[in-house]
Each structure stands twice: as C-alpha cells, then as structure tokens.
Amino acid sequence: MKKIFALAIFLLGAQSLSARDRQSFDKGWLFTLADSAGMSKSDYSDRHWRSLNLPHDWAIEGDFSPSNPSGASGGALPGGIGWYRKHFSVNPKEKYDRFTITFDGVYMNSTVYINGHKLGTRPYGYSTFEYDLTPYINKKGDNVIVVKVDNSDQPNSRWYSGCGIYRHVWLTKTMKTAYIPQWGQYVATSPQGDVRVKVDFAASGKKMKLSVRNTIYDAAGKIVAKSQGVQEQKLKVKNPHLWDIGKGYLYTVKSELLVNGKVVDVATSTAGFRDVKFDARKGFFLNGKNLKINGVCEHHDFGCLGAAVNEDAMHRKLTILRDMGVNAIRSSHNPPAPELLNMCDSMGFLVMDESFDMWRRKKSNGDYARFFDEWHKKDLSDLIKRDRNHPSIIMWSIGNEVLEQWSNAAADTLSLEQANLILNAGHDASTLAHSDELSVNSLLTQHLAKIVKEYDPWSYRPVTAGCNEPDPKNHLFKSGAIDVIGFNYHHQWVKDVPKNFPGKPFILSESVSALQTRGYYMMPSDSIYTAPKEWWLPYTDPSFMCSAYDNFHASWSSTHEETWDVVKHNDFVGGQFIWTGFDYIGEPTPYAYPARSSYFGIIDLAGLPKDSYYMYQSEWTQKDVLHLFPHWNWLPGQTIDMWCYYNHADEVELFINGKSQGIRKKTVYGAKNEGDAFRKSTEYHVMWRVNFEPGEVKVVARKNGKVLREQVIKTAGAPHHLVLKKTYQGHQAYGSSDPTTFVEVNVVDKDGNLCPNADNQIFFSVSGEQGASGHGFLKTPTILGTDNGCQTSLERFTDSHRKAFFGKCVVVIKGKGTLKAQAVDLKDASVAL
C-alpha cells in the first residue's frame, strides 16, 4: 500500500510540473453561521468571520436539543444556513489559463460564487461537482470564492447528515488549448490482463494534431504496458497480479493528452484486475473462488468528529472492521467520499456504491425527493463517472427502500404517515404489480439502471437496490432491471428466493438490525426482546438501553446469529450487508430523545466493539477467538448468564473461583425441513447460567483435550486510577502532517481491573511538543472530540470532558504532544502522542 501511495504521489508530482496542477483548496477559509444580504459579493466585509480549514461540519459543534428541527433521527443537532469565503490570488505569470474548482461534497443546497458571479447551485449533499472559474478569474488581484450552504429545511435526512463543506475542495489548473474534462478517463480491466482505456478531451477548435498516450505502471512503479493513439485504446498486461480481498494490488494508468506531440494534460487512475461473478445457485465468486460477502452498511459520520472527512478516522474504521472479518462496505445510502473508495481499493474491501435513499416519493419533509426529477440523471451519472475506475466497487445500488416499490397510485399525495406505513410494513397486495404491463415505477427503475449501464458499459457490475418488499410483484423487481436481487431484512423469505426469482443472483442488501448498548445486559439472555413491537408504537424504558447479548432487535429484523445462520448455510445467498458496522449519529431506534444516536452497530459510536463483534470474528476470520462476557461485578447470589464466543476449539469449560461450571460445545443441528433451502442450523455461542460470587470467572478452551487458550475476568474493586491506551495513531499518508490519534480511557481498580460500571467524569488537557527546529517553540495539539458510546450522552462532542460509560471513553487528538486525563478521586494518567 505504501508503494502504491508513493507511486501516486510521484505521478501527481510529475504532472503538476508540466501539464496539470491539482492542489488542495482546503486551507484558509472564513465561515459564519448566519445569513444576510450581500454575503456573496466580493467586497463584503468578512474580517470578523471565523478562520478555519476544510473539511468542516458546523452541526457537530452544536448542542443537542429536542427543539432542533432535525429531530432525534437527525441527531438532534442544529442545521441552518452557513457561508464560507476564501480569498486567493493567481500568479500573473501563471502558464495555465483554465481554472476549475471541485467540491467533493457540500451538505446541502450549496450555491457557489466567484468574484460576485454566481457559478451554480447543487442541491444533493453527497454529489461531487465542479465549476469553471476561468471566465471570472482575476490574475492581477484578489479573488474571492463564496459558498452558501442552506441546510435549514429540516428534517431532510433519516440520519445525521452534517452541515457544511464537509468533504475536500480542489483547485485544478490546465490549458484551454486542450484538456481532459472531469472524470474523462475511463479504465476497464479483465482478469486476463486486458485493459481498455477511453479518454475524453476538449479542444479549442484550432487546427491541431491530437493523440493520447497511455502508460500502465505496476505497484512498484515499473512500466508494464503502453500505447499511443486515438481516444479509445486497448492494452495488455502480462500475468497481472489480481486484486483481492485484503490484497488490494493496484496498477496506475496514466493518460497523457498530446497536441502536436507535446503533452498538454494528463489524467491518472488506479486500476485492479479481478474477476467478479454473481451466480443464482452458488452465490458470489471473486477470482474464481466461491466466498461470502461479509459486509456492513456504513453511514458517513465519524462519531464525535461528525461528517467532516478525516482520513485517519476513516482508516481506523476500516481497520476495526477488517479485524472483525468484514470484507465489504455498503455506502449507505448515498455516494461515499472519494477517500473511502481509495482506501477500499488499497486495503482490499468490496464496495456496494449506493446513489439514493429516495426517488420521487419523500421520506421526510425536506429530503432529496423534491430535487429528484430535475437532478437525478446528473447526480447518478456523475457518481458512475467519478467512481467507475475503482476495482473495489462490485455493484451499483440505485436506491434504498424507495417507496416506488409499491403502487404508483397517488404517488405524490402520500402523507408521511402513509409513507412510513408502507416503508416499514409493506406486503400490502393491493400496492403491488398485478399485470405484465410495467408501471411508472418499474419504468423509472429501468431508466435509472440504463443510466448506470450507459456510463459504465465495459465492466460487469450488476445493478441492485435495497428492497424491503420481498414479493416478486415489487415494482422494482417487475422492471427486470435489477440484476442482483437485494432484500433488506426478511430472512424468513430467503428460502423462497430460488422459486420466486429463478435464475437471479441474490444478496441480503441490508440485514439484522439488532439493537445493543455496549456493556448493558438483559436477562434471562435466552429471551428475545423486540422493540418497538410495531414500528408506529412508542417504546420507553427508563434505561434507554438495549441488551448487549444478541437477544434484542427491531420488530422487522433478527438477531445476528439468526441471519448469519441463513447466509452461511444457503449457497445461493451471495452474502449480506449488516445494519450496521458502527453506531452512527441519529436514528436512535427504538427510543426518542434524549437518545440521539443509533443502537444498531456491532461497534459503538466511540469505536469500541460490542460483544457480537467477537461472534463475527470467530466465524469470519482465522484469528483465535475466546470471548467471555459479561463482566463479573454483580450482587451476591444474583443469577447471571455467561456467554462465550470461540473458535478453533472442541469445547470450553467455565470456572468460578476454581470450581467447574461445566463443559459446553456449540451445537450443529440437522436440516430444519428436509426439502427446503435451509440445510442446517448452528449455535454460535455457548451459555452457562450461574450464581454470582465475588472473585474470578475463567473460561478454558480445549482441542483434543489440550488447553489452547484461557480468559479470566475478575471482580473489580472501587475505581482507583485511569489508564490511557493509544488504540489508533494516524498516518501522514492519509491525513495531514499532524495525524489524528484515538486514545481509549479505562477506569480501573488498584489492581488494574476494568471497573465495568464506572461513570466518572473525566477531564482532558493537552500540551505541545518542543519544536523540531530548535527555536524553542511549542506546538499545541488539539482535542477534536470525546465520546463514550452512550446513545443518550448529551455532552457536546467537541467538549474536552466526557463521562465514562461502563468504564470507558475515547478522546480524539490532532497533533503531537502529551494528553493528560484527570478525574475526581482518581489518579491522573498521561500519554505521549
């Protein structure tokens, strides 16, 4: 991965010296969370505005409040209207004469100006877009870029969206004589080493001889193929290294545009050789190997850091998921940041690239449905053109749980209550297709799929959609345009897929929706808890928590073990995308405010794994897993259910203070129904029901009678001191020169045992490190945020203090220096960054 990154830097550096100069435009912006006339004008006084660098999310800096119109589903954080301004100058001797600005993402309703001239508006908050600055650029004086961001029409999202210019911004300089437009390089490969490259270009109209020169480099920077000719070319790489899961071997394709033999512009892209196949009987194949898509759905926020892109936080997320055994990411439910796809390419993750959460029918008052008719073709085609060269992408999703699955009768007059009824209940036969004549909704599905195929015609990437209506009369399915059938939930219907969709490959595009709070356990653990019983019924519990045993889920969903069993034991199921990998801000099902973040994640909002993480790790990886839970701090004599996830062992035995509580083995059952699609069923944990007594509980794993591993949990005493552990140190390759560090904070007793019920308020401070130049200056690091995974914590994310939640919290710091943690009556702790 380092070699690949170094090669990309070399190539970009080379091009910046000659034909093209693309530079970050993130630094030196001014911002105000206000709105008044004249802010778009170049001479508007902005001297009192706040200085900041992008990416930026202003909502995460705000206070939680039930009065914020985003509601608990939107994270109960503020929206509003914000303005950004950036002053810059251009070298009057600049050789370039064409200037464009690219925004990777602005949420939402952005309007951009240059020197008082309006460049355009882009409503969709997840689209990448470009404007040509050339006609208005001032080469002899000050230039002012102004961006208005209007996220005041709330609610407009079913989850936390963030507010502002939350992704990167780029300034690109080229020559007007001839240039390659945005996303003008299209690269497609075959596993046999065939490469097809098409390069679009624009020219000034003068008489000139144009040609394209393509060069392919391997990961070591060696030229492995080259050609020169017309716009579309075919090349061959001999014995290519295949791109694979966990082995993201990347080639680089450099396309140079030549005028009369001189290079005037260049575009580069990574490329990978892999063979992707979906099969109706055997599921999914990569490079000829039959395997399961072990995926998760991910929203775009980074917990306490909000929606603003942070490459270190992004890489940390992927690293934690990879260690769990995840091999695929679904970008739920919108186009992802380009950096996520770059990382998935290099780390070897599969990707379902998703476009929309709604089409013409709205799910919330201010959502994208109001822009769909005018903007969907532009937004979808831009997504495909931007992302089509990424080898990690194996399928395109044109929508998630869109209400067009059901009848188009009164399509635009549904109330939100009616829409939610259809969305969550479904299965009303009267709203499904009743003839072979295609409905408006089926035709719309075909239209969207056609756009995908138009802009990605060379690579076999199927079109799918996340559908929570499993009936084959679903209007999306009736269209015939869905290449891979995707069910959201409904694992009970999976057995009928081969009958209902003959010849069609199948995946669970969204699954599970278990509800869990890290560190909280509801007993008896063999009881299944569902909440709410029906989606429209209010659910309240004084704890505002959900059980961390795998025994609590939403009414439309299942436990982790139940759905994994279906996926594992049915060959035709290509895999699943679990809802979700990480908790995310917003959508706090089953609760209302003060809950403000989700319970769905296998990993909490702070990035701390819940217990089910280890079930997947025991099934999806070759790591040795032995995970006993819960903690061992209870009332004397209290009946406690102890669970254990394990692998690579025949049996496990539990001991309390040295006394055996019995041996357990995971059970594999025979076929539930001999003739149906389900072949067998498996237990993925073992359990002991025991009486608590202070001391220690130990589990021992054996194979063939030989002890393999042991785990001991001791009864913790009173909180005594803090322990700081750097769990992730950022990489300069992904972030800036000041990497982001994540530090886990544990409250422990005098012997170092975690205090599982500790909720101490912990205060953080940072100090700088000595300057490397020897001038004696101090550079102070910054606390970016704090979190503890508690869904009802109303402490501001940007505060420098946080209560421990079940003994733990996390602090995020940017820069180098020392972090100090303090709490009343506890010994301090510090760690060097």
Language model features: what each stretch is:
Residues 278, 621-641, 647-649, 708-742, ...:
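Short S/T/G/P-enriched beta-strand
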Residues 42-45, 209-213, 246-251, 647-666, ...:
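Short flexible loop/turn segments that cap and initiate beta-strands
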Residues 20-36, 47-91, 102-106, 142-207, ...:
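Non-catalytic, glycine-rich low-complexity segments
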Residues 21-25, 32-35, 79-181, 204, ...:
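Accessory beta-strand-rich segments of carbohydrate-active enzymes
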Residues 198-201, 254-256, 642-646, 700, ...:
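Beta-strand-rich structural segments
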Residues 138-140, 200-279, 688-695, 703, ...:
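Extended acidic/polar, glycine-enriched regions
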Residues 33, 51-67, 117, 168, ...:
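Extended substrate-binding grooves/exosites of carbohydrate-active enzymes
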Residues 1-21:
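Bacterial Sec-dependent N-terminal signal peptides
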